[in-house]
């Protein structure tokens, strides 16, 4: 597969022509399996980050060019015949080192390369080839509504503006997949619980499924209210207006509640990504700015937050006592657990009560030793995959991105000491021949955090640019009032700003959740106490009630 440099087999060769270190070895040495809990932020922060990531990015698979996806390395960790013959194969070799499965003779981790513009015939002769993103670049909840009219229609009920759902086990759930073995995993019965949504990854882990289900239920709650208030509205009018409201609430949560945690509120204010207590429209749409998702953001900077993942998921009672704990790798692509009695609400409470792992260089072993293990005793390594994906996408080096961001540029390994620890510099020296060879996925993850942020200066630079582009490159962004035909009224915008929060979303869409702390991304504390759900602000939908038109000749 030809990428930007025109070489078919250069995935592990640096721009300087040096052999790059084995991704699995790099993962083990630089990103070992340890757990340090975040002292302030809940697991919601990690999980909402995955919601956002899945909304704006989906690595293109071979299905878009009508080609079956190859198996490059099988479930037993052995190379297949396709490994050498299929151009999309780039299986990750497992080195014979301690803690690297050498005892059970596993040879590799499966890895399938991303489909590029060259593969689809969209690259001119001699031009660079780029990896394809199957999702839209806008914060438009495509993971709920889909990315096309046809997909959206297939997910709609067709009446009352509602989305399709099913009722069973005392709850309301996303539609059931026709064949769970094909959609979720071959290791479960064909009729087992497995969901269909706007994004195919809804089943990936239980807490992702919980939050996506809540967003789906929120749409139908709002649609029912609008339908009751506005009897003359047809199905499509209700659907489109509900979708517009839900997306606006979601954008408000992202920009004013979630992203300040990752990027730092002051950093966002300084870069005009948010504004101080806005009361009016923010008309910053620029038709010359593309909201497109950069390769550096989606393939490196935002994947850094895989470090936040916890390998044990708490199911928590209403009184916040622990009921039980799930092992993450038991439930990859097996969402049935969320339909067990009290599990849906219990996992939602757990997301809001359990701390996430700290943003650091350490990863939970459930993601680096047991990823997607199915019924096997061992699995894959998410961090090794992240490193390999960066090379697959031909990311510029860590040093190149520091230069692009206007940061100090190291010429030697020792020059890194200003922002990377000496112990990590020593590890980098043992893996890379030159400082210019360091992967962006690796170097950026080792930087000391920038002021107010949960990431270092290089990733912060990339992320600030990205989220500025997403808001200013979207003419439908909820705070934009330039076009009165698509803008919210001032009073509607005000209630969206006041009544949109993750806490309210969880309260309204649990099965029997009675209480929540107001700032659900933040751990419970004396300044963030658990309160009754009814006390939390909500969006006032009466502001969408259509005014009755006067009859002709009626002067009253």
List where the protein language model places each region:
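Terminal regions of secretory-pathway proteins
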Residues: 1-206, 224, 229-556
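Alpha-helical bundle segments that constitute or directly flank the non-heme di-iron/ferroxidase center
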Residues: 205-217
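Hydrophobic faces of stable alpha-helices that mediate helix-helix packing
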Residues: 216-220, 395
């Amino acid at each position: 597969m030809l990428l930007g440099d025109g070489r078919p087999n250069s995935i592990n060769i640096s721009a300087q022509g040096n052999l790059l270190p084995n991704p699995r070895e790099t993962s083990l040495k630089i990103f070992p399996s340890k757990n340090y809990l975040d002292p302030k932020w809940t697991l919601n922060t990690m999980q909402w980050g995955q919601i956002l990531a899945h909304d704006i990015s989906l690595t293109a698979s071979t299905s878009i060019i009508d080609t079956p996806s190859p198996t490059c390395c099988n479930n037993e960790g052995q190379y297949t015949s396709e490994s050498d013959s299929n151009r999309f194969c780039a299986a990750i070799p497992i080195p014979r080192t301690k803690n690297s499965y050498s005892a059970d003779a596993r040879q590799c981790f499966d890895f399938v390369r991303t489909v590029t513009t060259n593969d689809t015939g969209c690259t001119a002769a001699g031009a660079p080839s780029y990896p394809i993103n199957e999702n839209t670049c806008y914060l438009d909840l495509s993971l709920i509504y889909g990315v096309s009219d046809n997909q959206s229609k297939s997910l709609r009920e067709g009446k009352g503006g509602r989305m399709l759902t099913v009722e069973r086990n005392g709850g309301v759930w996303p539609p059931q997949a026709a064949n769970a073995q094909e959609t979720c995993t071959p290791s479960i019965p064909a009729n087992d619980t497995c969901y269909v949504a706007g994004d195919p990854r809804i089943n990936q882990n239980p807490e992702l499924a919980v939050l996506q289900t809540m967003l789906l239920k929120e749409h139908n709650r709002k649609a029912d209210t609008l339908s009751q208030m506005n009897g003359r509205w047809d199905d499509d009018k209700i659907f489109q207006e509900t979708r517009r409201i839900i997306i606006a609430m979601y954008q408000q949560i992202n920009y004013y509640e979630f992203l300040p945690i990752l990027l730092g509120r002051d950093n966002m204010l300084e870069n005009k990504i948010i504004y101080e207590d806005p009361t009016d429209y923010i008309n910053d749409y620029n038709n010359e700015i593309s909201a497109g998702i950069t390769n550096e953001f989606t393939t490196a900077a935002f994947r850094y937050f895989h470090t936040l993942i916890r390998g044990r998921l708490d199911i928590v009672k209403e009184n916040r006592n622990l009921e039980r704990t799930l092992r993450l790798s038991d439930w990859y692509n097996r969402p049935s657990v969320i339909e067990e009695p009290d599990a849906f609400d219990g996992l939602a409470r757990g997301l809001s009560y359990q701390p996430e792992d700290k943003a650091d260089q350490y990863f939970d072993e459930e993601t680096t030793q047991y990823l997607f293990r199915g019924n096997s005793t061992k699995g894959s390594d998410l961090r090794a995959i992240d490193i390999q994906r960066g090379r697959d996408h031909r990311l510029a080096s860590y040093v190149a991105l520091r230069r692009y961001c206007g940061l100090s540029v190291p010429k030697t390994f020792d020059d890194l000491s200003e922002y990377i620890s000496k112990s990590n510099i020593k590890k980098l020296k043992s893996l890379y021949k030159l400082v210019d060879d360091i992967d962006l996925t690796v170097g950026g993850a080792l930087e000391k955090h920038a002021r107010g942020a949960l990431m270092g200066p290089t990733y912060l630079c990339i992320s600030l640019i990205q989220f500025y582009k997403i808001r200013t490159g979207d003419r439908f962004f909820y705070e934009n009032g330039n076009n009165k035909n698509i803008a919210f009224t001032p009073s509607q915008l005000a209630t969206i700003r006041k009544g949109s929060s993750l806490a309210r979303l969880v309260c309204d869409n649990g099965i029997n959740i009675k209480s929540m702390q107001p700032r659900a991304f933040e751990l419970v504390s004396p300044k963030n106490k658990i309160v009754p759900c009814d006390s939390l602000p909500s969006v006032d939908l009466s502001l969408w009630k259509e005014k009755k038109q006067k009859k002709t000749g009626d002067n009253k």
